[in-house]
Amino acid sequence: MTTIVSVRRNGHVVIAGDGQATLGNTVMKGNVKKVRRLYNDKVIAGFAGGTADAFTLFELFERKLEMHQGHLVKAAVELAKDWRTDRMLRKLEALLAVADENASLIITGNGDVIQPENDLIAIGSGGPYAQAAARALLENTELSAREIAEKALGIAGDICIYTNHFHTIEELNSKA
């Protein structure tokens, strides 16, 4: 799978992801970019799960952002509704972490749109490791959002066999 982590701190929000793509037990590619900017660089998003499924969801999410003039929560709720109710979309296996200057959300195929505590998101196979590391760093250091995301992703990569050390990181200024 993968690890995606998002941290919001001191006027910045970051989403970072590793680059490993696996097929069964085999690493197929080590430099996949699972984090990208959407909607005129005002939204950042990362995915965990099937690559083709995630790219389909990115496209659909960007359309929802366009329909709702970039309103992150409305676009996320609409995507989650479609994902849950459409027979073809329901088969897509991925999780999305998305953020803009105001909010950080997890979007699932079950129709869930979750705004996590402390605006800390960690999804994918290495998610629990990254979340524990990021939480400890948030509570005990003055590191920036970017530094926390990098360190948390590095720790997840040391522990999770489905997470590597090729990182893609996107950052936005944040109001929260």
Swiss-Prot record:
InterPro entries: ATP-dep_Prtase_HsIV_su, Ntn_hydrolases_N, Proteasome_sua/b, Proteasome_suB-type. Na(+) binds at residues 157, 160, 163. SUPFAM superfamilies: N-terminal nucleophile aminohydrolases (Ntn hydrolases). It catalyses: ATP-dependent cleavage of peptide bonds with broad specificity. It is an enzyme of class 3 (hydrolase). GO terms for molecular function: metal ion binding; threonine-type endopeptidase activity. Its main location: cytoplasm. GO terms for biological process: proteolysis involved in protein catabolic process. A double ring-shaped homohexamer of HslV is capped on each side by a ring-shaped HslU homohexamer. The assembly of the HslU/HslV complex is dependent on binding of ATP. HAMAP family: HslV. PANTHER family: ATP-DEPENDENT PROTEASE SUBUNIT HSLV (PTHR32194:SF0), METALLOPROTEASE TLDD (PTHR32194). This is ATP-dependent protease subunit HslV.
